[in-house]
Swiss-Prot record:
BP GO terms, sorted: amino acid biosynthetic process; aromatic amino acid family biosynthetic process; chorismate biosynthetic process; shikimate metabolic process
Active site: 72 (proton acceptor)
UniProt: NADP(+) binding residues: 128-132, 152-157, 210, 233
Taxonomic superkingdom: Archaea
Family in the record: Belongs to the shikimate dehydrogenase family.
Protein's gene: aroE
Protein name: Shikimate dehydrogenase (NADP(+))
Organism: Saccharolobus islandicus (strain L.S.2.15 / Lassen #1)
Length: 269
């Protein structure tokens, strides 16, 4: 973080609700210092009433913002424009000068390419139907996933996501649980790492976890136990932050350097 805030200091921040746990200010303030950027990153923890009252003001004074639960979809109507990916996904998690982007989507594509590469022939099960689920479902579909199954507590949100995916030419449906026997990729985009049954994990080629505190959730522990490839929530958090900084500054600190810093500060375990 900057030792001194001055007239030229740029404002960045995270908008969400009940986000006391977030690591985003540590990640971005570390990056700003490392890159020599005169900027500060703050957290704006807003209930719905406060969000509606101050979002336009924040968009005017902030150089860039990140957006998390529950505002990834709601924020779009306040923006001047959105890029191709976030428009299709209908969710934004990064803003630069009132333009919206989705770096969750970019992070999933980046990380899955490293772990597996082409997804042709894989069946993908996405637990959850919110903004993160949308980003993951679109990323996996674009990497070639043959089908996307949405598993969610309520059918209303699941139906909306399935319709959105099918409208974009992908093969999506609602399932109560995973019932395939091979070539499965499982994504947990919910706050509950226990939502994915162990027998589903056993059949998977890759599991993807959005929860990052702790890094080794029950889902990740089971993936390790059965020798399954995995992408943990910290990898996603850091990579989407790096992609956001590329949008803001056309440069960033490496994923590895940020993760090393977070562990050194004992901010993750």
């Amino acid at each position: 973080m900057l030792e001194e805030i001055n007239y030229d200091t740029k404002l960045f921040g995270l908008i969400g609700k009940n986000i006391k746990y977030t690591l985003s200010p540590y990640i971005h303030n570390f990056s700003f210092t490392t890159l020599g950027i005169n900027a500060v990153y703050l957290v704006f923890d807003l209930d719905e009433m406060k969000f509606n009252r101050i979002i336009n003001g924040l968009l005017e004074i902030a150089e860039g913002l990140n957006v998390t639960i529950p505002y990834k979809e709601e924020v779009m109507k306040y923006l001047d424009n959105t890029d191709t990916y976030s428009t299709r996904i209908q969710a934004v998690n990064t803003i630069y000068k009132k333009s919206g982007y989705n770096t969750d989507y970019l992070a999933i594509k980046n990380l899955v390419r490293k772990k597996i590469g082409n997804m042709s022939g894989y069946e993908c099960y996405v637990y959850g139907a919110g903004g993160a689920a949308k980003a993951a479902a679109f990323a996996l579909s674009e990497l070639g996933c043959s089908s996307i199954s949405i598993v969610n507590r309520t059918n209303l949100r699941a139906n909306e996501l399935v319709e959105l995916l099918n409208k974009n030419g992908y093969n999506a449906s609602i399932k109560e649980n995973c019932n395939s026997t091979s070539n499965i990729v499982v994504v947990n985009s919910t706050p509950n790492p226990s939502v994915v049954p162990e027998n589903c994990i056993q059949k998977s080629e890759l599991v993807i976890e959005f929860v990052y505190k702790p890094v080794e959730t029950e889902l990740i522990k089971n993936a390790k136990k059965y020798g399954i490839k995995y992408i943990d929530g910290l990898e996603i958090l850091v990579n989407q932050a790096v992609e956001a900084e590329k949008i803001w500054f056309n440069k960033s600190v490496s994923d590895e350097k940020i993760i090393e810093y977070l562990y050194a500060r004992k901010l993750v375990w």
